[in-house]
Amino acid sequence: PQMADDCLFCKLISGEIPTNKVYEDDICFAFDDIEPEAPVHTLLVPKKHYDDLCDGIPAEVLGHMLSVVPKVAELKGVRESGFRTVMNTGPDSAATVKHFHIHILGGVKMGRFTFENSQRVQD
């Protein structure tokens, strides 16, 4: 797969930097977040480097990755209790690594999403 020289996630995928691997196949790789925001916080990334969801990721790759999410949730013990998936894109999203990834969060009862200065939109 194509990798970016300066990408942290590409270095984790290649084994250049060690990580706690949760799942791997020909298309994607899952590992635990080093700064978890929930008891379970695993990242699922494509092995080929794409900056974000707007970077022309083939539908086959996205579809495969979404089909892997329940497997990762099962491996992490949150498939039955429930989990949240998040994909951040662009500057306002608080994304910190420019390599597309799906956050899989669980292990705790979650509330609504909250945002900086958020207001619920009224109809």
Can you say where each PLM-predicted feature lies in the sequence?
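HIT superfamily nucleotide-processing domains
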Residues: 1-123
